[in-house]
Regions:
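Conserved histidine-centered catalytic loops in small-molecule metabolism enzymes
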Residues: 26, 259-260
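Active-site-proximal loop/helix segment associated with metal-binding centers of metalloenzymes
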Residues: 134-196
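Core catalytic region of metal-dependent phosphoesterases/phosphodiesterases
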Residues: 14-20, 24, 29-124
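Conserved beta-sheet core of the metallophosphoesterase superfamily
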Residues: 110-117, 130, 135, 139-151, ...
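Structural motif
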Residues: 20-21, 52-53, 127-129, 212, ...
């Protein structure tokens, strides 16, 4: 049975399956406007007692890097909410995306989040699910995969750690792409979203044990029943859609957050 320990709080044990699961992705905290961030915090506050598990499928943060002795101030509100959520008994699992793959021990040891190496196959609401953020999965993305391998290497992390956050953060923001998406200067890549959906269909065809394929990255909410009882799910984003998915043993629903 997986076990999560968080410094300064009780140990929490979770069963191998969850009856009610929320999936969210591409929140991009640190770049979305304050009202969007507050909406996501309100969303998290609504979850205790309502669900068993939260899966964050990449790009929770627009940029995340674990320094040895500091955390980024801008993320304190969401880290506090996530820690409180774990304390109520909600299991939180996190897949690193292309913006926040530089995770380390802090999120697990201090917050209580389980970090997943994706692509991975896990159980979500009694369904066998193939889960990945979605970046670098398609044919023709070999150059990106090579670049990703370099920037996620131990040597690159060590070099990046030498730069103080006040210097590195503005540089990262310039190459993020999220500000342009917020301002409407970066259009949705519909062709890539379509190709990722086709990849999901191929996975379901090739792996009959799967009930569900879950991707993020495209920022396009999608729920497709490929064949009876077998689905492709993309939870969308919180830049434009404020969308998420609710999975139970009986159903899968795409929803949009509208706080009262």
């Amino acid at each position: 049975m997986p076990r999560v320990s968080r410094s300064g709080s009780r140990d929490l044990s979770f069963g191998m399956t969850a009856q009610s699961t929320i999936v969210a992705s591409d929140v991009h905290l640190g770049e979305i406007p304050p009202d969007g961030e507050q909406a996501f915090l309100s969303f998290l506050e609504s979850l205790p007692g309502a669900i068993d598990e939260l899966l964050i499928n990449g790009d929770l943060f627009d940029f995340w890097f674990e320094y040895r002795s500091v955390i980024l101030r801008r993320y304190f509100p969401v880290l506090r909410r996530l820690a409180d959520l774990v304390d109520t008994g909600v299991r939180i699992r996190l897949v690193g995306g292309n913006h926040d793959a530089w995770t380390g021990s802090f999120l697990g040891d201090e917050i209580g989040i389980e970090l997943l190496d994706a692509p991975t196959t896990i159980t979500l609401a009694n369904r066998r699910a193939y889960v990945a953020h979605g970046d670098g999965l398609l044919a023709g993305e070999g150059a990106y995969r090579a670049f990703r391998g370099v920037i996620r290497s131990r040597a690159f992390r060590a070099l990046f750690r030498l730069a103080p956050p006040d210097l590195s953060l503005p540089l990262v923001r310039r190459v993020s792409g999220t500000p342009a998406r917020l301002e409407g200067q970066a259009g949705d890549d519909h062709e890539r979203a379509d190709r990722l959906g086709e990849h999901a269909r191929s996975l379901l065809a090739d792996r009959p044990e799967l009930d569900l394929v879950v991707f993020g990255d495209t920022h396009r909410p999608e729920l497709v029943e490929v064949e009876p009882g077998r689905h492709y799910l993309n939870a969308g984003d919180w830049i434009h859609h404020r969308s998420y998915a609710l999975l139970t043993a009986e159903s899968i629903e795409l929803r949009h957050w509208h706080p009262d």
